Amino acid sequence: MSIQVFCDFDGTITNNDNIMSIMEKFAPPEAEEVKNRILSQELSIQEGVSQLFQLIPTNLHDEIIQFLIETAEIRNGFHEFIQFVNENNISFYVISGGMDFFVYPLLQGLIPKEQIYCNETDFSNEYITVNWPHPCDRLCQNHCGLCKSSLIRKLSDTNDFHIVIGDSITDLQAAKQADKVFARDFLITKCEENHISYTPFETFHDVQTELKHLLEVKL
C-alpha cells in the first residue's frame, strides 16, 4: 500500500480562489448569479465554469496573467510540504478545476507538469472557451468538468491510501472516496453535511504535521 495525495489548487495551494479573483476583476455583474448557482449546486461545475469564462473577452489574456502573478499567494508551508512528500516518496498530484493558463505558471518550479491535472482554455475566439480533458468516468455522473474522483480512480490503486486536500464544493466528490480528508472553508461545510470525516487545516504546516504522524502510525 502506498500513500497518494490529491491536492486542489485554487483556495488550497493558493490562499485565494483564482477563478473567483478573475471574475471579480474582469467579469460583468451577471457572473455573480452564475457563481451562486454553482455553489448551490443548481448548475453543474462544468456548466457553471464554462458560462463564467464565456463572459471574459480573450483580449484580456495578458492582463489577467499579470494580475494573477501580482496577486496570487502560495499558502504558507506549501514549499516545505512538497519537500516532505518528496523525501518520503509520497505520490503527490495537483487535481485542479483551475485553468492551464494560470495553474502551470504559478506552479512552475514547484511541481512537475506531469503531476498537474487541470482544465484547458482556448483563446482563439472572442470569449474564453474552456475545454475539459478530464471528464467524469462511468462511475460519476455529476458533470464535474475536471472530475477529481475519476482522476483518483485513474491514478491510483484501490489498495492505496488516498488523501484529499481541498477547500470547496469542487472537492466534495473526491472527499467522498478519500481515506483521509484535509478540509478548509466551504469544504468543511459540505463534509459535515455529508457526514464525511475531515481534519481542518489553514496552512500546509498543519497538513505536514498530521501526515508525519500518519506515516509513523502506519510504519
From Swiss-Prot:
It is an enzyme of class 3 (hydrolase). Pfam families: HAD. Gene3D superfamilies: 3.90.1470.20, HAD superfamily/HAD-like. It catalyses: 2-hydroxy-5-methylsulfanyl-3-oxopent-1-enyl phosphate + H2O = 1,2-dihydroxy-5-(methylsulfanyl)pent-1-en-3-one + phosphate. One of its GO terms (molecular function) is 2-hydroxy-3-keto-5-methylthiopentenyl-1-phosphate phosphatase activity. Keywords: Amino-acid biosynthesis, Hydrolase, Methionine biosynthesis. Belongs to the HAD-like hydrolase superfamily. MtnX family. It comes from the Bacteria. Pathway: Amino-acid biosynthesis; L-methionine biosynthesis via salvage pathway; L-methionine from S-methyl-5-thio-alpha-D-ribose 1-phosphate: step 4/6. It comes from Bacillus thuringiensis (strain Al Hakam). GO terms for biological process: L-methionine salvage from methylthioadenosine. Dephosphorylates 2-hydroxy-3-keto-5-methylthiopentenyl-1-phosphate (HK-MTPenyl-1-P) yielding 1,2-dihydroxy-3-keto-5-methylthiopentene (DHK-MTPene). This is 2-hydroxy-3-keto-5-methylthiopentenyl-1-phosphate phosphatase. Its EC number is 3.1.3.87. SUPFAM superfamilies: HAD-like (SSF56784). The gene is mtnX. PANTHER family: PHOSPHORIC MONOESTER HYDROLASE (PTHR28181:SF2), UPF0655 PROTEIN YCR015C (PTHR28181).
